[in-house]
Amino acid sequence: AALPELDPQALAPITEAVARSVELLGDTPLIGFAGAPFTVASYLVEGRPSRDHAITKALMHEHPDVWDALLAWVARTTGAFLRAQGLAGASALQLFDSWAGTLSVEDYLAHVQPHSAAVLAQVADLGMPRIHFGTRTRHLLVAMREAGADVMGVDAQTPLDEAVALLGGRTPVQGNIDPALLDGPWAELDAHIRDVLRRGATATGHVVNLGHGVPPTTDPDVLTRIVELVHSVPDLLPDLPPGSLPHPDGAP
């Protein structure tokens, strides 16, 4: 049976939540968020998180017509979901492809990229930055950008300056503080953040963010300290060596 199309009225709680958040945030931008077609489809097919997405890939290769129909449906639904957030006041929109890193470049280009591109095309006329992110997607960065992204999110496994170079030095990046360090010693996290900032200075633009989601055990005060640290660091030069960023209190 055909999957039902999304009823626009179902998005009313989303648009209300975004509008209220934007009002409360004032000048602080809000990034809209949606799961990309491959990642959403993998949950539909597997029914749970998967290490290798073998069942998903089997459907992709053994029944390509079914696969394309499924991803086209997800793309329409996701595009409407993302567009609603943009119209409600989000400042940028992010397409989050958590599990795309399990794909080869060939499979991504043939079976996934067209559907991610369809999502990003649905919000192109809104005139706001479109961010595309995936984990373990170093080998897919260029292909993911070519789906229609203005900014590329980079995971914690890929050094930010390497990602910038792979993207030809012309694409702003987002990332990539390692979430695994948020529960560790502050000194280690502090040094890591400074290194991320140094590497990000090689890009044409850098949205400082995590390299994946916030772990549920994270102390919110740590996130506050991260924001304060990032705002305290002066503009960086691309040739600053690791460990050379000054501490805000003047300590070495």
Language-model region placement:
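Active-site loop segments of alpha/beta catalytic cores
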Residues: 10-252
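Alpha/beta catalytic barrel-like cores
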Residues: 1-10
